Amino acid sequence: MSILVVSHDAGGAEILSCWIKHLKIKEKIIYCLKGPAISIFKRNIGSFENLHEKDIKKIKIKKIITGTSWDSDIEKKIILYGKKNKIFTCSFLDHWNNYLERFTLKKKKVFPDKIIVSDHYAFGIAKKKFKNVPIQLIKNYYKLEVLKKIKLKKNKIIKKILYVAEPIREHAIKQHNNPMYWGYDEFSS
C-alpha cells in the first residue's frame, strides 16, 4: 500500500516537500501534483512519478497527505475520495488565513481526518476553527532550510524577515475587490 501526496499551490508544496524530504518514510510515495507544486517538489525531492488524478483509483492507498490550495480543488476532491473509500487523510495548512475556505468544495465542507500545522500561531487558530478535527504541530522544515541559507550569507546583517507565502493580491481581489485592501501585496511588502 502507498501514501498519496497531493498538492497544487506553492506555499503548501514548499512545506510538504521539505517535510517529506526530511522524513524517513518506508512506504512507497505516489504523487499527484499540479500547478507550481510540480517544480517545487522536483527542486526539493528530485525526480518522481506524477500520477494524474483520474488514475488514483488504480492504486492501493494507505494514507493521503495534501496541501490546502486556495486556487485549486484537487486536494479537496482527493480528500473527498479518501473519505468515501475509508482512506486516512491529513492536510497541511501553510498559513494563517482562509482556513475554512481551504476545505470548501461546491459550498460543502470537506475536512480531512487530521490537520497538520507548522507553527504555534497556526496551531491556535486551527484549534479554534476545527473543533472536531485533530490538529498536529510539526517542525517547519521549509523554514529551517530558508534560515540555513540566510545564515550562509554571514556578511549581511538581517534584522527581520518577511515571509509572504500567499498570493494575497488575489485573495484581496476575490474577497474585497481591491488588490491593495491590506495596504500591501506579496510584491510590494
Predicted regions and their residues:
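Nucleotide donor/acceptor-binding cores
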Residues: 1, 158-161
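Active-site and donor-binding regions of nucleotide-sugar-utilizing enzymes
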Residues: 4-150, 164-171
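Donor-nucleotide binding loops and adjacent catalytic segments primarily
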Residues: 17, 21, 160-189
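A short helix/loop element that forms part of the nucleotide-sugar donor recognition site in Leloir-type
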Residues: 148-158
